Each structure stands twice: as structure tokens, then as C-alpha cells.
From Swiss-Prot:
Residues given in the record as ATP binding sites: 90, 108-112, 509
The name this protein goes by in its record: Protein translocase subunit SecA
Subcellular location: Cell inner membrane; Cellular thylakoid membrane; Cytoplasm
Lineage, broadest ranks: Bacteria, Bacillati, Cyanobacteriota, Cyanophyceae, Synechococcales
Gene: secA
EC number: 7.4.2.8
One family name in Pfam for this protein: SecA_PP_bind
SUPFAM superfamilies for the chain: Helical scaffold and wing domains of SecA (SSF81886), P-loop containing nucleoside triphosphate hydrolases (SSF52540), Pre-protein crosslinking domain of SecA (SSF81767)
């Protein structure tokens, strides 16, 4: 009703941008007359005007004033360098991002290109801009691809990758625009706040940040905090024994009701992801282990057994993790990617290693942690892009204070979303998926099948192999993951079948008919890797091998080093055609020239990738070899385009890409992301979801209604069920899950908010010490507070002065400051409390000057080094202990809900008291350490 009265708020918002779009369009002709050098000069002029304004508010006003001109410059640069012109709707997207909102843009509408506009504008402040992506590949791709526009205009572009050293990181963070993943940014922030020297700090002050796939980062990953940890030794045999014991325990068929245990040794609650021993299970475990109490603090077992049961029941191989190089590697549930280096905490990862009979790694202790919510709230300017923001609009607004604006598509959507097909059993569903895939494939249309786990993708792969349907498999398995971009880029070819685990944030567009640009790059890599890349590097990435109907997917084991063999063996199903003799000769000459200049197998794969990517750019270059590489790339691309243009037409006529979903995800948003792969930029396309009543979502969250439906439907397993009640159950289950996980994220955020205020105080103190030129004043400040606290502890203002315990007070002062050895009670007997504090503080300052003169005689500057060392040492040690105490408090505080107390308020109050105590201990320990500091002299060492 309100919408009818006042109109759609999103439409009203979009109208506000229209006059600015017209102004940018008006400037287009004028800007197009400028030479390349003129564009660079304009950039420098704008940068000097904006960056010289130090007042934050006035600088913001300047950005608004120059926005139309800046956007017009970026549009022109993009036309010249990328041959891509920003549409009007993309200009609106850029303005929405500049205003620190979330821009919802459908798949294929050019989100990556949109980001160039606000990034360029905000980089003119000279304070740096961060573009955040979900993985290293996308960060690298965008830095190479979109970075061309910024480099062309004279701005510096940085890229942060996993294997970079601190010097490279600092250099890249100092660039005008830096591309990085969310985890690299977060971990660098934590590492910077553990640095012991200001030169080890790699990041500068945060300014403005654009997050690509913002929902993936701020919502999906918000449940898991970033943690830097150190190793703690725990007995490995306990994990192994608990794993053996878990196999002997019997799972209960149902959950306990009204406090009565079900039959069995333990119950599994999949919704809460927990395993609980029954009384019978407790007795069995105690008998097997020969102990009286599983919770005995001197010999605890309960934690190990619970983790072993969770490893057995809830952490499934090829779903939650895969085994790679004899290690259990986590698979990201949202993106389907492996996360090497990440481990589950609280001994869960060790329990999985014991279950799989792998070497058990030591447990860890948290040294530093932060949630993504609180990390990204550190940016004064935060914006994001996604294809699906409206489903999470409330959460963006409440947690991050971010508005969402839907950007209209440039062309009308022609995608058809066919109705779901629901089957009674999972077997029936997979048979139907294989059948539909085969039918659509035979029509000459490309098919993309989205699965939710590695295990399911391999099940479908074997079904399609039985049907003799050639297909590509993209999941977290290492042999498939390195072909990711190639597989997705070719997923739009006629009759192509691609099975992909969780398509969220894959980043590569599926172009109908195939991507000629990517194929050309791939062709050159196939030829050049054996000739230019070091043999030990050759497997990264190996030369792609086309999957046939019988293969299990993957790569050719070894690339031939002979050029002719590489060319003649190019699979016609991978590349659209065989290259003609003239181009083959051109490639042969290119190879000889590159080997002569770059050396025989002297490069790493990344170096070769870099050079091919540079050659694929349109930016001007003086490097003759890059020019030669560019000519060859262009020739191969044109040759492939001849075939692919015809193939694209054929695919369009057949109906475009068909997307099949094989399970409803926990979030409707991820389902929409999968659907959004079809029908990009006005293309034809269709989607359909195949579901079964045995799917996790319905089984765990559907409740009794779905269980009753299963019994009610007396149909064959391969017969689809259509029912309004079923559809409603499905939607209600999905909403239940979304609410459930939102509550978890909200709770994580609320509890971390308490830690966040403490973290800011500690990191602020640390930074002051790292940069501090006036450390002496800081330490004396600690000492003065300590003296004041000693007086408050030992002197009771309600008692007359003759009853004050002066001797104990003097003894405590001497404990801290041995240089005040001659302090006597008669010196202070007649002083008031305030005078006493002032006197002791004055004595502290005199003693500190004396200590400094002693230390400085040994080596000038040593006192300042000692101050920095002791403050950082105390902050780091006490903060680490404090984090552990806060974790323990959080676990114990939950039980107070039973006593009608709010656990969060209890956590805030007690956490605050613990924090004050930590800061007090830090100050006292620093003062004590400074006065006890006795550096070795050369004379001492000789003795």
C-alpha cells in the first residue's frame, strides 16, 4: 500500500542519480578529444587538488564536485584500454558505491568494470583504496584486467597474494589502488598489530574499500573469525584413543525428549551440529578408558570424545574436507574451494586427523583474532557489490549500516526459471538430473550443474560417464581446481556439460559459444609452459586435458617439450579449431624468440602468466617481446573467433545456457547466484532445481511435516512430486535456516563487539609504542599510575593517619623500584593521601632518570629500545592470556541464562573488569621490568 502511495524507494533513489549521469554523458565528447597524456595530466591535476585538502569534510565535498569529470575520464580510459564503455546503469552503480552503499547488480552486468569508477575517484585522495575479492585468482585477475585502466591514467596498482613477503606487501599496500582477498587483508591487519618494529607494519591507515561479492564476505564468512594462533602441545594418544572409542559407540536413532535419554550411546543434533553422550554412553566410555570421571580436570576426556563423535558424524570426507598430501584440508561450504592453512579450532581438526589416521598436528592457542564484521567496520568508507543483496538487506543495514540499492539491468532478462522437481529419494533425484542433463546436451545447449559437495559432484560425474556424456568437473579436488577459470570460461560452448561445486563467487562469466580471449591465452600457455617454465614448476598449472565420457577428469601428467607435438595434439574439443599453418609458423618463431631472450625453462608459472596477461592488455608497452606475444595472441584469438561466433549463434538459437540446481542451499541468495549464471546481459537461458525429500535442508530443518509427507507420498523414486504444501515446507525450511544462521552471526558480532573495543584500545597502545618517539613519558605515566594505585591499596582514607600501614606501603614501592632503597617511613608520615601520591610520583621520576643515566652509559639509545621491548612484550603476553580467559568466560557465561541473567551483559561486565585488570598488570609489569633491567656489558661477559 505504501509503495502505491509513495512509489518504490529504490526507483526514487535511482532518479536522484539521473542528472549526474546526464552531466557525465555531456562531458563524454569533450574528454574524448583529449590525448592519452592529457588524460594522465587531468588525473594528476585532480589528485593534487583533492589530496592537498586536509579537512575530511571539505575533501568529501571536493570528491562530489569532481565526480562527473572523474567518471567521464575513467569511461574514456576504459574505452581506449579495454574497449569497454560504461553503460549509464554502470555509472549509477559507481555512484552508489561511492556513497558507501551496496550495489545489487545481476550476473554479467559488469560489476568489476563498475568498481573502476569509485576506486579511481577515491584514490585521488592519496589515502589508498582496497578492492576486496573472495580468492587470490580473482584479485589477480582484476588487478591485471581492471588495473590497466588505472595504470593507463597514471595511478599505481598493487596486488596482495598469499606467498608475498612483508617488503612486497608494504610496497603493494602503498599503491593508490590495491587488490586483495578478505583473508589476506584481515591477517595482515592482525600481523601488523603483532609487529615488534614499525618497519614490519605493511598496511597504512584504512580509507575506502569496495568488496566484490559482498554477501559472500560479510555474511557467509561472518560466522568464522580470523585467528592467528601459536602451537600448544597436547597428548596425541588421547585423540587416537577417542577416535577408536567413537567407533564402538552406537548412535541413538532419535533425540532425547522431556529429559529422557533415547536408546544408544550418543545423540546427534545436526541442526545445532553437536553430539551429546547419553548416561549409557558415559558409563561405556568410563569403563573403556578405565576412569571414574570424564570431566576430571587433571585427566579430562569429555572434550576429546565429543570431538571424535563430531568428526565421525558431522565432518564428512569430500564434503567438509578433503585429504590432500596426507593432510585434512577444509572445504569452504559456500564456495566449494579448499582452504589450505586453515584449521578447525578447539581440537576438532586433530579429531578429524585421528579419524583419518593422519599425522596429528599440535593444537593451537589464539594470539590474535577479529571477525570480518569488525574488521571491515574499521574502514571509514565501505561499499560492496553483489548480484543478490536484497535477501540480506536487513542484516547489511543493522550490522554494517549499509544501504542496498538495486541497479537496473542494461538489457531485459530473458531467462526462464522452470518449476522445481521434487523426488521422494535422493537416488531418484540424481537419475532425473542425469537424464535432463543428457537431453539438454543432445539439444546442443550448454549445461551447468551446481552441486553442494565434492562427493555429490563425483556421484553425478559417474552417472554421466555411464550415459557417455562428456563433461568437465569443477570442485575442490586439487586436480580440478587449477583448471577453474578455463572450465568456467568454456562452460558456454555448444553441448558443454559442467559440474561445479557451489558456484558462488566463481568470478568468471559464462559466455555463450565460449570465450575466445581465454582460449587464446590457454593455447599460448600450452605451447610456452614446456619451453619457458622451470621443470619443478611445470605442474602448476599442468596443461589441461579434455574430459571424455570415461575419464575421471584432470590433467595430462606431463607436457611434451616439443613445440610441434603440443600444436598437433591440441584437442579440437578444448580449442574450437586447428590453427592454420601461417599462425603455427608465427607461434614457432615466437617460441624461439622467447626462449632466446627469457631463457630455456627459467620462468615460474606465475611469471609466464604475468607476461601473457600483460600481452593480453591493450595498454601501451615498449617491450618488444610483449608486443610480439600480443601479436600472436591476437592472431590466435581472431582465428578462434571465426568459429566461436558461429557457435554462439547456434547456442542462442538452441535456447542458451541451462542451469540445474541439485539441492536448495541454506540461503536463498546462493540459489539465486546459481540461477544468475544463465541469461546474462539479455541472453536466453533457463534454470531448474531438482530436490529430494532426503536433502539435508528438508531433513534437518523441515521438521515432522516433511517426514509425514515422505510416508504420505506412495510414488516411485523417479516420479517427481508436485504439491503446494511441499513448496511451502521448502520455503519455510529455507527461511528457518536463514534466521538460524543470522542469529548465530548476530551473536558472534555482539560478543566480538565487546572484544572489539578492547582490541582497539590494545592495538592503539601498541601502535603508539611502535611509532613512539616519547616512550619515556609513556613509561613514567605507567609508573605514576602504579604509585597512585599502591597508595589506594594500602591507605584507607577512613582511618586516621597514625593507623595507616606506611611500612607495608614502602615495602611494596621498593619491590617495584629498588633504587628507592633509602625511602623511610618518617619521610612520608605527615603527608596527606594526595601529597603522598605526589611525593612517590616525584621519587619515581628521579629514580627513572637515575636508571636511564646508568643504562645510557652502556650504550646510547639502549633505554628507548628497552622501553619499547618491555611494553610490547607485556602487551602481547597479557593480551594472549586475556584472549584465552575471554574464551573461557564466553563458554561459562552461557549457563547463567538458566539463572535468569543475560549472558551477554554478564560477558560485557566481567570482560570489562578482566580487561582493566590486564591493563593494570601490563603497566605494573613494565615498570618492574624497566627497573630490574640489567643489560650485560662486555666486561661482565669476559668475566
Amino acid at each position: 500500500m505504501l509503495k502505491l502511495l509513495f512509489g518504490d524507494p529504490n526507483t526514487r533513489k535511482l532518479k536522484r542519480y539521473q542528472p549526474i549521469v546526464e552531466e557525465i554523458n555531456f562531458l563524454e565528447e569533450e574528454i574524448s578529444q583529449l590525448t592519452d597524456d592529457d588524460l594522465r595530466k587531468e588525473t594528476q591535476n585532480l589528485k593534487s587538488k583533492i589530496s592537498s585538502e586536509l579537512d575530511f569534510k571539505k575533501q568529501k565535498e571536493l570528491l562530489e564536485e569532481f565526480l562527473p569529470k572523474a567518471f567521464a575520464i575513467v569511461r574514456e580510459a576504459s574505452k581506449r584500454v579495454l574497449d569497454m564503455r560504461h553503460f549509464d546503469v554502470q555509472l549509477i552503480g559507481g555512484m552508489v558505491l561511492h556513497e558507501c552503499q551496496i550495489a545489487e547488480m545481476k550476473t554479467g552486468e559488469g560489476k568489476t568494470l563498475v568498481a573502476t569508477l569509485p576506486c579511481y575517484l577515491n584514490a585521488l585522495t592519496g589515502k589508498g583504496v582496497h578492492v576486496v575479492t573472495v580468492n587470490d585468482y580473482l584479485a589477480r585477475r582484476d588487478a591485471e584486467w581492471m588495473g590497466q585502466v588505472h595504470r593507463f591514467l597514471g595511478l599505481s596498482v598493487g596486488l596482495i597474494q598469499q606467498d608475498m613477503n612483508p617488503v612486497e606487501r608494504k610496497k603493494n599496500y602503498d599503491c593508490d589502488i590495491t587488490y586483495a582477498t578478505n583473508s589476506e587483508l584481515g591477517f595482515d591487519y592482525l600481523r601488523d598489530n603483532m609487529a615488534t618494529d614499525v618497519n614490519e607494519v605493511v598496511q597504512r591507515k584504512f580509507n575506502y574499500c569496495v568488496i566484490d561479492e559482498v554477501d559472500s564476505i560479510l555474511i557467509d564468512e561472518a560466522r568464522t573469525p580470523l585467528i592467528i594462533s601459536g602451537q600448544v602441545e597436547r597428548p596425541q594418544e588421547k585423540y587416537q584413543k577417542a577416535a577408536q572409542l567413537s567407533l564402538k559407540l552406537v548412535k541413538a536413532k532419535e533425540l532425547s525428549k522431556d529429559g529422557i535419554d533415547p536408546e544408544g550411546d550418543y545423540e546427534v543434533d545436526e541442526k545445532q551440529r553437536s553430539c551429546i553422550l547419553t548416561d549409557q554412553g558415559f558409563a561405556k566410555c568410563e569403563e573403556y578408558l578405565g576412569v571414574n570421571d570424564l570431566y576430571n580436570p587433571k585427566d579430562p576426556w569429555a572434550h576429546y570424545i565429543t570431538n571424535a563423535l563430531k568428526a565421525k558424524e558431522l565432518f564428512i570426507k569430500d564434503v567438509n574436507y578433503i585429504i590432500k598430501n596426507n593432510e585434512a584440508v577444509i572445504v569452504d561450504e559456500f564456495t566449494g574451494r579448499v582452504m589450505p592453512g586453515r584449521r578447525w579450532s578447539d581440537g576438532q581438526h586433530q579429531a578429524i586427523e585421528a579419524k583419518e589416521s593422519l599425522q596429528i598436528q599440535p593444537e593451537t592457542q589464539t594470539l590474535a583474532s577479529i571477525t570480518y564484521q569488525n574488521f571491515f567496520l574499521l574502514y571509514p568508507g565501505l561499499a560492496g557489490m553483489t548480484g543478490t543483496a536484497k535477501t540480506e538487506e536487513v542484516e547489511f543495514e543493522k550490522t554494517y549500516k549499509l544501504e542496498s540499492t538495486v541497479i537496473p539491468t542494461n538489457q531485459l532478462r530473458k531467462r526462464k526459471d522452470w518449476s522445481d522437481q521434487v523426488f521422494k529419494t535422493e537416488i531418484g533425484k540424481w537419475k532425473a538430473v542425469a537424464k535432463e542433463t543428457a537431453n539438454i546436451h543432445r539439444d546442443g545447449r550448454p549445461v551447468l550443474v551446481g552441486t553442494t559437495s565434492v562427493e555429490k559432484s563425483e556421484l553425478l560425474s559417474s552417472l554421466l560417464s555411464e550415459e557417455k556424456i562428456p563433461h568437465n568437473l569443477l570442485n575442490a579436488k586439487p586436480e580440478n581446481v587449477e583448471r577453474e577459470a578455463e572450465i568456467v570460461a568454456q562452460a558456454g560452448r555448444a553441448g558443454a556439460v559442467t559440474i561445479a561445486t557451489n558456484m558462488a563467487g566463481r568470478g568468471t562469466d559464462i559466455i555463450l559459444g565460449g570465450n575466445s580471449d581465454y582460449m587464446a591465452r590457454l593455447k599460448l600457455k600450452e605451447i610456452l609452459i614446456p619451453l619457458l617454465v622451470k621443470p619443478d614448476n611445470e605442474h602448476k598449472p599442468p596443461i589441461p586435458k579434455q574430459r571424455n565420457s570415461k575419464s575421471k577428469g584432470g590433467f595430462s601428467k606431463k607436457a611434451s617439450s616439443k613445440l610441434k607435438k603440443n600444436i598437433s595434439n591440441s584437442s579440437t574439443s578444448l580449442f574450437p579449431c586447428k590453427l592454420d599453418e601461417a599462425i603455427e609458423k608465427q607461434l614457432s618463431l615466437l617460441s624461439d624468440e622467447l626462449v632466446k631472450n627469457w631463457g630455456d625453462r627459467q620462468l615460474s608459472v606465475l611469471e609466464l602468466d604475468d607476461r601473457i596477461a600483460t600481452a593480453a592488455e591493450k595498454a601501451p608497452t615498449d617491450d618488444d617481446l610483449i608486443k610480439l606475444l600480443r601479436e600472436s595472441l591476437s592472431a590466435v584469438k581472431k582465428e578462434y573467433e571465426k568459429v566461436l561466433t558461429h557457435e554462439e549463434e547456434k547456442v542462442r538459437k538452441a535456447g542458451g545456457l541451462h542451469v540445474i540446481g541439485t539441492e536448495r542451499h541454506e540461503s536463498r541468495r546462493v540459489d539465486n547466484q546459481l540461477r544468475g549464471r544463465a541469461g546474462r546481459q539479455g541472453d536466453l537461458g533457463s534454470t531448474r532445481f531438482f530436490l529430494s525429500l532426503e536433502d539435508n535442508l528438508l531433513r534437518i530443518f523441515g521438521g515432522d511435516r516433511v517426514a509425514n509427507l515422505m510416508n504420505a507420498f506412495r510414488v516411485d523414486e523417479d516420479m517427481p512430486i508436485e504439491s503446494g504444501m511441499l513448496t511451502r515446507s521448502l520455503e519455510s525450511a529455507q527461511k528457518k535456516v536463514e534466521t538460524y544462521y543470522y542469529d548465530i552471526r548476530k551473536q558472534v558480532f555482539e560478543y566480538d563487539e565487546v572484544m572489539n573495543n578492547q582490541r582497539k584500545a590494545v592495538y592503539g597502545e601498541r601502535l603508539r609504542v611502535l611509532k613512539g618517539n616519547d616512550l619515556k613519558r609513556q613509561v613514567i605515566g605507567y609508573g605514576e599510575r602504579t604509585m597512585s594505585e599502591i597508595v589506594d591499596a594500602y591507605i584507607n582514607p577512613d582511618l586516621p593517619p597514625e593507623e595507616w600501614n606506611i611500612d607495608q606501603l614502602i615495602s611494596k614501592v621498593k619491590e617495584f623500584i629498588y633504587l628507592l632503597d633509602d625511602l623511610k617511613s618518617e619521610d612520608i608520615n605527615l603527608l596527606s593521601i594526595e601529597e603522598l601520591k605526589n611525593y612517590l610520583q616525584e621519587q619515581l621520576r628521579i629514580a627513572y632518570d637515575l636508571k636511564e643515566s646508568q643504562i645510557e652509559k652502556i650504550r646510547p639509545g639502549l633505554m628507548r629500545e628497552a622501553e619499547r621491548f618491555f611494553i610490547l612484550q607485556q602487551i602481547d603476553n597479557l593480551w594472549r592470556e586475556h584472549l584465552q580467559s575471554m574464551d573461557s568466560l564466553r563458554e561459562s557465561v552461557g549457563l547463567r541464562g538458566y539463572g535468569q541473567k543475560d549472558p551477554l551483559i554478564e560477558y560485557k561486565n566481567e570482560g570489562y573488569d578482566m580487561f582493566l585488570e590486564m591493563m593494570t598488570n601490563m603497566r605494573r609489569n613494565v615498570i618492574y621490568s624497566m627497573f630490574m633491567f640489567q643489560p650485560k656489558t662486555e666486561v661482565n661477559e669476559k668475566k
